[in-house]
Amino acid sequence: MIKSILTQIWNQRRANGWLFAELLIVFVLLWYCLDMLYGFAYAERQPKGYDLEHVYKLRLSTNPKQLVLCSSEDSLQSFWFKPMEEAFRRIKEYPGVESASIWLGSDTYTRDAVFQGYTIDSVGVKDANVRYVSPEYFKVMRIPIEEGTGMFSGNIDAFESTTGSSLAFGSAQWNPAVTPLPAVISLDLADSLFHTSRGVLGKEFFDYYSGSSLRYRVAAVCSHQKSDDYARYESFILMPLPSWFYRWQAVPFISIRVRPEADTNDFATRFSREMTS
């Protein structure tokens, strides 16, 4: 019976051409959908390179009526650096906060991205997501360090180990005033620059557009990084907060990690109310 049906279909193949075309289109579309769903499921299961559980992102607001003169060091200290440091200190000392960090640059789960090109020979350029961070950032986000783990294994205090406003959110090891600048690069960027992700500690590279005047030293290599659950792994570079952060009065983000037992359903509401009261 089946043979008879197949024979009849073959004999009427000219008249049923549209049917075969329709089946082919359905098959291709179904294959495409299944392939896409498999890709999403596979990407979701891959580590992101950071841990956002019990992590909150805070936005600082400024007083638009308060003019701060960039040319006046006293004005910057009184109305910008000191209030920001005080706000950061209060956030760190809030009950239930395990750690806190300040950062700027490429954000996760958003379209806010900052890119820059880097090179080792002025010929080939490798683009990377840029993130400027205080040294506590690696503890807050729990970023796995593949090489150079000793750099952030100690108890880093952003204020005790620094002097002056230019290093307010740095440390002795994470110093934005030294040359070459320390940088933590992802495995992908290490492989793009040096064609290997191992044994690159201490190696130097520089900004493709600024030339060798802006040099970086690999202080550590972190795990693969991606911007959201379903994104592909991308090249990332993390470095100390730059000098223009202080000159231009940039308003940073603050990320905090809350202890699991303190991260209740009303934590965000309670935190906002008590910190602004």
Show which residues each predicted segment covers:
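Short, strongly hydrophobic transmembrane alpha-helices
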Residues: 12-42, 50
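Acidic-histidine catalytic/liganding microenvironments
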Residues: 12, 91-95, 197
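Membrane-proximal extracellular/periplasmic loop immediately following the first transmembrane helix
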Residues: 37-125, 130-131, 176
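"Rare, low-scoring activations can occur
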Residues: 87-88, 180-181, 187-188, 210-277
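Hydrophobic, well-ordered secondary-structure elements that form the walls
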Residues: 91, 138, 271
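Short beta-strand segments
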Residues: 19-22, 57-60, 100-104, 183-186, ...
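Hydrophobic secondary-structure segments that place a key small or acidic residue at a functional site
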Residues: 124-236
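A short amphipathic helical element positioned immediately N-terminal to and/or at the very start
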Residues: 2-10, 87
